[in-house]
A protein has these predicted regions:
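Conserved class I S-adenosyl-L-methionine
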Residues: 1-42
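A short acidic, Gly/Pro-enriched loop at the edge of an enzyme's catalytic core
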Residues: 89-99
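SAM-dependent methyltransferase
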Residues: 134-216
């Protein structure tokens, strides 16, 4: 069982606000001449729109429950992406891809440098000649990370589109600046029609944040050349005010 197995049934509700990257990945998939591989595909948030756009896509995730949800959603959408259980650090597929994507900061879930290198090595082996890797990471802002440390704050109110049930999502973070690790604890309170809490669930995970030139060096060390670095999913050039790093790289 992985961290996300117990979170699969509410993952899409919790992260329903994350939509600004979908069209970006769909367009990049349409532009490439060949199949697409998504690592950390989860419930198919990006996989299914890419497949619906007519692109051949394979999705890999290490959570059985998340993949089951993705398969159900794909069937409902009338698309047939290939969805497989696997780990981005050691996956081995008997084929190559024109594009490999790692959306929504999933690369930051690799907590050790050795894991990052292993994943990039696997990606390099699965990229066809001229193929590209695209992944995203947030820009670490130390003053903001410090403000959030050990505090609990309200993120958003949620409504299940199928049942109409309401929930309140809160987040607590702890920052280890020495190891560049953020520990996140999400709390989901599900409410009845009176607004009283009837169920409370938690989800904890860690991310190892990384800086621009740290990732630049990591890619170079692993045999990649940076083609583009965007600061938003509108393909704006990365700059001082950017909150995202969207990396586009190819094998040297």
């Amino acid at each position: 069982m992985t961290l996300y197995d117990n979170w699969a049934d509410i993952y899409d509700i919790v992260y329903s606000y994350v939509r600004d990257d979908i069209q970006f990945y769909v367009e990049r998939a349409q532009q490439c001449e060949g199949p697409v591989l998504e690592l950390g595909c989860g419930t198919g948030r990006v996989t299914i729109p890419v497949a619906a756009a007519g692109c051949e896509i394979v999705g890999i995730d290490n959570s059985v429950a998340m993949l089951d949800m993705a398969k159900q959603k794909a069937a409902n959408a009338g698309v047939q992406p290939v969805l497989e259980l696997g780990d981005m650090r050691d996956f081995a597929l008997d084929r190559q891809f024109s594009l490999v994507i790692i959306p929504f900061r999933s690369f930051l879930g690799l907590m050790a440098v050795e894991d990052q290198i292993a994943a990039l090595d696997r990606i390099k082996c699965h990229l066809a000649p001229g193929g590209k890797l695209i992944f995203s990471a947030f820009v670490p802002e130390l003053h903001r990370l410090g403000d959030d440390e050990d505090s609990t704050y309200h993120l958003r109110d949620l409504t299940d589109p199928q049942t109409g049930s309401r929930s309140v999502l809160s987040q607590q973070t702890a920052v280890d600046s020495y190891n560049q690790v953020i520990a996140v604890r999400l709390s989901l309170e599900q409410l009845d029609f009176k607004g009283e809490v009837v169920r409370k669930s938690y989800h904890e995970y860690e991310m190892r944040y990384a800086y621009r030139y740290e990732l630049d060096h990591l890619l170079a060390r692993c045999g990649f050349e940076v083609v583009d670095l965007y600061g938003s999913f509108d393909s704006e050039e990365f700059g001082p005010e950017s909150g995202e790093m969207i990396w586009v790289a190819k094998v040297l």
